[in-house]
Amino acid sequence: MIKYKYIKTISAALISAMLITGCSADNSGSTVNDSSHGVLAGSTDTSAAAGKNTDGDSSDNSTNESSGSASNSSSSATTVSSATSIDTSDMFTNRDKEIGYDESTSVKLTLNGDSISSSSSSVAISGSTATISEEGIYIISGTLDDGMIIIDADKNAKIQLVLDNASINSSTSAAIYVCNADKVFITLAAGSENTLSNGGEYIAIDDNNIDAVIFSKDDLTLNGSGILTINAGTGHGIVSKDDLVITGGTYNITAASHGLSANDSIGIADGSFTIVSGKDGIHAENSDDEALGFAYIAGGDFDITAQGDGISAGYYLMIDNGSYNITTKGTGSDDSAKGLKAAGNLIVNDGTFTISTTDDGLHSNSDMSINGGSFTIATGDDGLHADNDLIINSGVIDITDCYEGLEGLNITVNDGTININASDDGINAAGGTDSSGFGGFGHDAFSADSDVNIYINGGTITINADGDGIDSNGNLYVTGGGIYVSGPESSADGALDYNGEATITGGTLIAAGASGMAENFGSDSTQGS
């Protein structure tokens, strides 16, 4: 039986503390684990056919799968079902990354205020509108006060637009409109500064509803090393109704709606992004196919201020690296204002994240895996929330302000450093529906009849909670790690709270909290003090 002792000098309220030390575990915070439960990795979900490669070349990217070794020697802990990551092997093609062009053989378009000039027969000019109809490379420079560039070519055509100090404003439509092509590449010329804008109105063209400064019905890639500033007083910044890929460049986007938006997928290899949006900063969603609408970010620098979500995916969201400063400001009960959000799995392998949100910091309607990275999170709701499995394999997570720190149906901590300052529970494995969440496809919802578990196999966890320190509406299993809980002074809460069984077979746990709801581990525990 585990022994514990009371401490009455922590505060004016009666406070209890449990000191449970490891006899057989490595208390350094890492754990060797021979169990597969809790690792969001392994097999590849081929239904997420990331990045349809139609460029006629092979991708030079290897498949990225989230990984993270995990171990657990506890025979009491049941296995948490694993999930899969995105196959990104053909997300970025060689052509996506190709920014070179031969100026001597390229077609030149010169913007002259209220007119456009070009000597090529593949460019039809009508007033201040130029329509490109053939495959090739087109260099655009100059200023167009009120007009647009239209791509209307063969369905197999690949067209490269080079913006070389180009400024285009359209008062009634997109500055660049891709009506028909196989794929269009927009290259920001080295050293160039380009500006695209809309004057506040979008008029349909041939029954096509256009609602972005750059609007593409087909695959769209942006690359290069120049600067692109987009101002969308109405509608979105950049939209692709197919795949949107960005492999380089500097982007300053101000949009009334989404900053970047795509139906099938968004893939970002690199770039610098400053986005101020009336809705989501980056948004991928496909209402017709649940296996589309995913987002993958390999790296880049992101500064996002959004009234909606910072980065939102209607299917999977996977981040391999990058620097992220995300602020969301939504306040409506029917709106979603999360930092990172996925309707499917949310996977973070590395990166630096500073997230300040009125809604959840990170949210998944399915499974979430944190395999690395550094996080500083201040939120009005949950720090990290998953409707199914929340798995932390590595990383430094500092949740400075939140309602609940970690929340999921099943929570597994295999390693990492986690600091939580919560106004309610520090860690909560929940059943039923949590009404604290905002709207969108991000309401907090759990299956009421599902098994609920918390597994702590390693890492260092420090919790300061006004509610329960660790609360499982099912079972609690501790096999390793260092856990330090400063629980509530309220007699209605406790440092530990569970509804099923609780066992400890390794690690160190020090818990302080009000004695009115104090609970201890069960007799099946092999740990003593």
Segments (PLM) and residue ranges:
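A composition-driven surface/loop motif
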Residues: 2-529
